[in-house]
Amino acid sequence: MPEAAVKYQPYPQIVLPDRTWPSKAITEAPIWCSVDLRDGNQALVDPMGHDRKARMFHLLLDMGFKEIEIGFPSASQTDYDFARWCVEEGNVSEDVSLQVLVQCRPELIARTFEALEGAHRPIVHFYNSTSELQRRVVFGKDVAGIKQIATDAAKMITDMAAKAGGGYRFEYSPESFTGTELEVALEICNAVIEIVRPTADNKLIINLPSTVEMATPNIYADQIEWMCRNLDNRENLIVSLHPHNDRGTGIAATELGLMAGADRVEGTLFGNGERTGNVDVVTLALNMFTQGVDPKLDCSDIERIKEVYEYSNQMVIPERHPYVGELVYTAFSGSHQDAINKGMKAIKQANKPTWEVPYLPIDPRDVGRSYEAIIRINSQSGKGGIAYILQEDYGINLPRNLQIEFREEVQRITDEEGKELPSKRIHQRFIESYVEQPGARIKFVDHHTYPAGEHKGLRVVAAEITDGGETRQIEGKGTGPIDGFINALSIYLGIELSVADYSEHSLQHGSNAAAIAYVEVEYPGGKLFGVGINTNIVAASLEAIVSAANRVLDVVGK
């Protein structure tokens, strides 16, 4: 790489020692304007045809956008025709303003008004580039010449609007604002404001675009606060942000710009746009939502938003994209899974509406996602994640020691295969290892109990089992079926077995609900779990003991 200090110059700092934005917070949603159908569309390899545009347009209306930039009708017949369709057939309610873009050229402005005929309070958005670089390299004009372009356009647009009977709104953008000296941007904007003469009933939108993101977000915030302080007739202006994402900080720049006094944001769904994209309004809205602020945009069906985005733009959303990517609500790490598992249990038990789950800043259900993909299992996963999947998907609530034991078995599989284990496979392995145990030596068949005669309080458990497929009758004594049955198995197998831990719960609800029993059996070499499932809880418990005994036999080699 070349020497950075020689080839690139740092962006100048803004002198604003009394800046106030760092102590501000976002407490209400801005005015949102979608520019998907203009800025977004112009950045596509294959620009949208009518059907793709119409589908995007209806989604934006359904989401609650009140301002939608529908195109550049003076630039192409396609955009002109779509603008007429929106006006005539778009079913646009009167609280929604259609916005169109136009350069500061007389013939383009005239065509723009033709495209908007019949629209309710549309926004005519005119712009010209004001940056020092473009003045010098592209236009060869001084500040006065660039200002003249803007003021001539402002005069023509306001005159044409008056001749058309009024009802128009106006927006002016000093394009490449972040590359323009603040004093120059202010001079040009104030000249436009003087011509448009905005009022409380018809405010002028002054859009301050980060056409190319050139510096850190705090500098953009300083620029916005400085402009908000110095613009003429500020009370009758709507200061708008239009950030891009060249440095990867478009979201942060927008949030700081709102803290600095801006009222409005132009952006696109999931940040589609030229180069690295426009600011992502979905992420912005959901960032506000997770801070307790109503974003005034409906993102409750994020899968539909994603589907329309991918259809209309012919682009795929990355798996890690905030709030919408396939993996953003998923944990593979063992420690993360354990924390999520405990957090989900805690929130179920807590009697309050506040969302508090580690590693999940938003409840996936709030955007139409389920809990199914929160935890997925691979070689990095831990006992908490495995326990969560079995609990959520199958109602199996593993005791802690069984979580540890079964995790080792799952770990062996993931290490061998080197890939993710789906929920169904984990459940299948659990049932095979602990319940069905194909090929196991001992199987439980039946049992009955009767008093132990001279031993008051004890009962004899007479049980039928199979050993290698052959029927055997065994007997043992104990205070109940579990105690007596493990005594019988100990005698029969010649291994001292005892119950170290026992728990059970129902798997379903109702009179025919199956019960699942977990029994941890201690033997001279350690402890192992067994699991039984049966509609009879006693039978489930005895099956669990047999399950554990078979695992002991595997270990001791009998």
UniProtKB/Swiss-Prot annotation:
Cross-referenced InterPro entries = 2-isopropylmalate_synth_dimer, AIPM/Hcit_synth_CS, Aldolase_TIM, IPM_Synthase, LeuA-like_post-cat, LeuA_allosteric_dom_sf, LeuA_N_DRE-TIM, PYR_CT
Q: In which pathway does it act?
A: Amino-acid biosynthesis; L-leucine biosynthesis; L-leucine from 3-methyl-2-oxobutanoate: step 1/4
Class of this enzyme: transferase
Query: What keywords sit in the KW lines?
Result: Amino-acid biosynthesis, Branched-chain amino acid biosynthesis, Cytoplasm, Leucine biosynthesis, Magnesium, Metal-binding, Transferase
Q: Determine the domain of life of the protein's source.
A: Bacteria
Names of required cofactors? Mg(2+)
GO terms (molecular function) for this protein are: 2-isopropylmalate synthase activity; acetyl-CoA C-acetyltransferase activity; magnesium ion binding
| Compartments, as annotated in UniProt | Cytoplasm
- Grouped into one coarse class, the protein's main location is cytoplasm
Cystine bridges: none
Which reactions fall under this protein's catalytic activity?
A: 3-methyl-2-oxobutanoate + acetyl-CoA + H2O = (2S)-2-isopropylmalate + CoA + H(+)
What function does the entry list?
A: Catalyzes the condensation of the acetyl group of acetyl-CoA with 3-methyl-2-oxobutanoate (2-ketoisovalerate) to form 3-carboxy-3-hydroxy-4-methylpentanoate (2-isopropylmalate).
Summary of subunit composition and partner proteins: Homodimer.
Q: What is this protein called?
A: 2-isopropylmalate synthase
- The protein's organism comes out as Rhizobium meliloti (strain 1021) (Ensifer meliloti)
User: Gene encoding this chain?
Assistant: leuA
